[in-house]
């Protein structure tokens, strides 16, 4: 949350030069507060597990957040009870005339599927186009990053020959960026993807600012300068055992997967993994909620015109 000081305090300019968020008394006394409305487009098969992961991160904030779950795939789910979907999810036509402070688009196990072969690809494009006028800030995660880069920037699908799976080290590029506020200079985060995100490609074909990279030079965290869209190519929401579940699933399927990198103690799948990215995930989502959503969203969502001033 921002600190509140008198307007004329010399520290105001000093801290703002470091991009520390300072709220003057004038702004604080005129700012109105209400619950934030956040829409989650859940594309993962195990929807309840994914809900738990994202809601855990979103709850770690002093801000009150009202969550709406969205589905766009009308096919019968093999992993989530129909009763759960009917009770807790809405369809797009039920919310398309509403505005939201935030939108999160989750990953999906579609790394080897061409975009046009995705059953709900037209609906994905519809939601992203709608969000331009109805959402203050959208956060894309893993596969959703690849989809958004294609829809919003025309970047073709980039696929790795081998799946990247494990916990990788990253470093921040802009220490004073709001989205990386409080991050360590280097931090760990999980990845589980075929998608490839070369930092050079992002720089050459978009106006997005890369805020953190992997040690191998892949873009991990990047965003638009107006804070309307943000992208995270990994899975900071994952539980300690999620990568293990994926690994053993693929073993049972006879896929001969590589052991996830830097994940099992002593690189032994029989050892219980430990989450080494939990603080990073909590801080990332808290920063997004505060700086990219709360601080720029209009109080009256009927007038969607996000601004920093």
From Swiss-Prot:
Pathway: Amino-acid biosynthesis; L-methionine biosynthesis via de novo pathway; O-succinyl-L-homoserine from L-homoserine: step 1/1. GO terms for biological process: L-methionine biosynthetic process from homoserine via O-succinyl-L-homoserine and cystathionine. It is an enzyme of class 2 (transferase). One of its GO terms (cellular component) is cytoplasm. InterPro entries: Class_I_gatase-like, HST_MetA, MetA_family. It catalyses: L-homoserine + succinyl-CoA = O-succinyl-L-homoserine + CoA. Transmembrane segments: none annotated. Substrate binds at residues 163, 192, 249. The active site is at residues 142, 235, 237. GO terms for molecular function: homoserine O-acetyltransferase activity; homoserine O-succinyltransferase activity. Keywords: Acyltransferase, Amino-acid biosynthesis, Cytoplasm, Methionine biosynthesis, Transferase. The record marks 111 as: Important for acyl-CoA specificity. The record marks 192 as: Important for substrate specificity. Belongs to the MetA family. Transfers a succinyl group from succinyl-CoA to L-homoserine, forming succinyl-L-homoserine. HAMAP family: MetA_acyltransf. This is Homoserine O-succinyltransferase. It comes from Klebsiella pneumoniae subsp. pneumoniae (strain ATCC 700721 / MGH 78578). The gene is metAS.
């Amino acid at each position: 949350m921002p600190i509140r000081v008198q307007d004329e305090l010399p520290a105001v300019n000093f801290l703002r030069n470091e991009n520390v968020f300072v709220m003057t008394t004038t702004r604080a006394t005129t700012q109105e507060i209400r619950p934030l409305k956040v829409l989650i487009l859940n594309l993962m098969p195990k929807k309840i597990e994914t809900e738990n992961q994202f809601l855990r991160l979103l709850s770690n904030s002093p801000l009150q957040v009202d969550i709406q779950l969205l589905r766009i795939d009308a096919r019968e789910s093999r992993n989530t009870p129909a009763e759960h979907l009917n009770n807790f999810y809405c369809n797009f036509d039920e919310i398309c005339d509403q505005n939201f402070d935030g939108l999160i688009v989750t990953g999906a196990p579609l790394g080897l599927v061409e975009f046009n072969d995705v059953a709900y690809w037209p609906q994905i494009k519809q939601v992203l186009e709608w969000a331009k006028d109805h959402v203050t800030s959208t956060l894309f995660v893993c596969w959703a990053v690849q989809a958004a880069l294609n829809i919003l920037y025309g970047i073709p699908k980039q696929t790795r020959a081998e799946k990247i799976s494990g916990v990788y080290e990253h470093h921040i590029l802009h220490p004073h960026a709001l989205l990386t506020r409080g991050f360590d200079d280097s931090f760990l985060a999980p990845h589980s993807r075929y998608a490839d995100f070369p930092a050079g490609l992002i720089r050459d074909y978009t106006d997005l600012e890369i805020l953190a990279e992997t040690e191998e030079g892949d873009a991990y965290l990047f965003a638009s300068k107006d804070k309307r869209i943000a992208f995270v190519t990994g899975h900071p929401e994952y539980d300690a055992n999620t990568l293990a579940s994926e690994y053993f699933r693929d073993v049972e399927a006879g896929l001969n997967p590589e052991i996830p990198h830097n994940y099992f103690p002593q690189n032994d799948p029989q050892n219980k993994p430990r989450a080494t990215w939990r603080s990073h995930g909590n801080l990332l989502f808290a920063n997004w909620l505060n700086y990219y959503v709360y601080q720029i969203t209009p109080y009256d969502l009927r007038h969607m015109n996000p601004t920093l001033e």
